[in-house]
């Protein structure tokens, strides 16, 4: 699969002009495969490669994890080139059109209290403000294929990092791109920056607190039906150069949940108000006003009902929901690929580790898109294919188990030929007979 996607060639191209061991691609492949199949430390990955899997070309890695660290150092030096070459190799093969980029950030924390410049305290999206962290950014296509990954010190702000992301991807010549992001990126400076050279943006907006948003919400108009649960309408606010287009999206499923939640809070309000029945006059009015001004309860007494205001350029409602693919990618990075714990202290190794996880994520997304199966199902199914080594008087032979129908379907969907039954031998036809006798 890796070869079919052109990853070795892409890494080889990034290696051009560098004095490197020609086996660096195999070493990086081992690290990516380990991350996708059995995430472990670099030292444990050596044992995994030697004892648990059949990986041609990586038999002589030895027992020193420095072989991995040297490859990771190269990966960091050529990070941008490797990611660019790998992505375009995948995009060309799968005919992916990069006209929409969905971007979001997450964080991963470290089991230490040291704040050392890259591992910094900041706003934790893992709900661990007591630990230093690193911020990770991910750009994803509308098909869910990751385009590129970034990492920043743990105190980096969303409003700043997206400008760096835009500037770096501009060098990739992706033509005209629609940027989709959450409301944390929706500053006026970011809009102006991203719309340079004809770019477009689709950002979420706060329901309240911004005059244009309030004006958009108050504007009458009919909703168009996108799906059974999603209705949208278009609203224009402002004049001249400041004129902005909004899409008011009404999610009926969320509106129903909001109504149920609002009902529970109203019941609580009624209970609280009934408790004030003994009060009268100004005291009662003051108590009621305090309840109705409650920062949590009062929001269920104003215009909400599942409506979301987003600033857009095209295909707004459906594209914004595509941010769920980015969130899913972050979950897979942390849970399936086990981004944490990070066993590295140096900034360059942490960055390289994150890039390795990105490469593994790209491979599993391609596999999922091609097969229609989740990666855990694919991995479990293919893990049932085993290789056995048989020895006898005539020599040695390594042979795999028969391919099951489920395995064959996965290989066919990925356009991968079935591996040879006989994986390795030393005395050709005589060994087969000897192996059969020893079995």
Which ranges hold each PLM region?
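Short, compositionally biased segments
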Residues: 1-2
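Anion-binding and metal-coordination hotspots
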Residues: 9-439
């Amino acid at each position: 699969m890796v070869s079919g996607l052109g990853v070795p060639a892409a890494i080889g191209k990034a290696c051009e002009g560098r004095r490197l061991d020609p086996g660096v691609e195999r070493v990086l492949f081992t690290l990516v495969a380990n991350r996708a199949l059995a995430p472990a430390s670099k030292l444990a990955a050596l044992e995994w490669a030697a004892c648990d899997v059949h990986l041609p070309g990586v038999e002589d890695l030895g027992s020193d994890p420095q072989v991995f660290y040297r490859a990771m150092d190269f990966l960091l030096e050529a990070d941008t080139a490797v990611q660019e070459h790998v992505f375009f190799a995948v995009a060309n093969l799968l005919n992916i059109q990069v006209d929409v980029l969905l971007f979001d950030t997450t964080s991963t924390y470290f089991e230490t209290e040291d704040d050392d410049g890259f591992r910094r305290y900041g706003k934790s999206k893992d709900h661990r403000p007591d630990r230093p962290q690193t911020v990770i950014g991910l750009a994803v296509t509308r098909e869910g294929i990751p385009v590129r990954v970034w990492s920043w010190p743990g105190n980096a702000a969303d409003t700043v990092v997206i400008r760096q992301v835009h500037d770096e991807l501009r060098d990739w010549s992706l033509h005209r791109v629609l940027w989709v992001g959450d409301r944390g990126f929706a500053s006026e400076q970011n809009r102006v920056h991203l719309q340079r050279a004809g770019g477009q943006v689709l950002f979420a907006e706060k329901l309240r607190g911004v005059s244009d948003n309030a004006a958009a919400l108050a504007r009458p108009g009919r909703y168009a039906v996108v799906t059974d649960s999603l209705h949208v309408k278009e609203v224009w606010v402002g004049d001249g150069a400041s004129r902005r287009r909004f899409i008011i999206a009404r999610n009926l499923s969320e509106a129903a949940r909001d109504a149920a939640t609002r009902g529970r809070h109203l019941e609580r309000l009624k209970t609280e108000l009934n408790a004030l029945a003994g009060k009268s006059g100004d005291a009662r009015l003051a108590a009621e006003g305090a309840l109705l001004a409650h920062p949590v309860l009062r929001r269920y007494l104003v215009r909400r009902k599942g409506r979301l205001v987003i600033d857009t350029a095209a295909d707004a409602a459906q594209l914004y929901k595509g941010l769920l693919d980015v969130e899913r990618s972050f979950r897979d990075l942390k849970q399936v690929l086990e981004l944490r714990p990070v066993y590295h202290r140096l900034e360059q190794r942490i960055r390289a580790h994150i890039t390795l996880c990105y490469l593994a994520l790209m491979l599993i997304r391609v596999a999922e898109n091609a097969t229609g199966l989740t990666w855990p199902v694919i991995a479990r199914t293919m893990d049932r294919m085993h290789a056995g080594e048989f020895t006898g008087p005539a020599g040695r032979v390594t042979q795999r188990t028969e391919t099951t129908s489920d395995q064959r379907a996965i290989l066919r969907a990925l356009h991968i030929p079935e591996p040879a039954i006989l994986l390795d031998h030393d005395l050709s036809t005589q060994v087969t007979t000897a192996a059969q006798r020893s079995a």
